[in-house]
Amino acid sequence: MKEEQMILFARALSICNNLSEKDQEVLTAVAMTLSGHPDVFRACYIAFMNDEPGYHYQPMIEAPLEFFYEKELVRIRRFQEEVTLPRSLFIQYASYVDLCLSRIYPLGSVIELDRELLPKDLVESFESEQMDFFVVLSGRRVDLANGHYVDYIGHGYPFGLRFDTSPLFLSNLFIKRVVSEGYSDTVDEHYCQEVLRKDYLDAGLISSVYAEEEVNED
């Protein structure tokens, strides 16, 4: 994890209300684990969205994580330390982990979608074309001009952009695995950090995934 990302996350966490210094320390440690294991972060948040009672991560070496999803609260436990957050604050916390710490895949990357999470009509569309659930990414963190951004825009692989099909708006949660990463260099890394992370935090932009969850909670 790059130092500038952790500094940005610390600034984001300071925006959250009613967090003690100890709470922030625990939540930072949890965030480092989640960002280092995107599959765990993904499974953890999907369980939350599905109103499951909890999610448990028990690694061989690292600290175990336990999430308990209650009606109005979320309890997060790491070893013997526990933080309790209102559901709305947990959503805000998750959005900052995603914004500041999650990997932003390069343009041109080919990813596989998780068909179990896709809308039925999209699954049928892929199947009718006899396509694998592969997508090539052509846009990242696209500002929707409503205070939110969509994680990725892409097109079905291997066809790419076609005039007879609309682009796909994709959430990080839909990504099952990365098949092939696109080209990246220091210019791309600088853009991701300074614009897609820092400028978005300054502008108050969050992923539409968490905006939708906020709407559902009201």
Q: How would you describe each model-predicted region?
A:
Residues 28-30, 78-119:
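Mixed-charge, Lys/Arg-rich low-complexity intrinsically disordered regions
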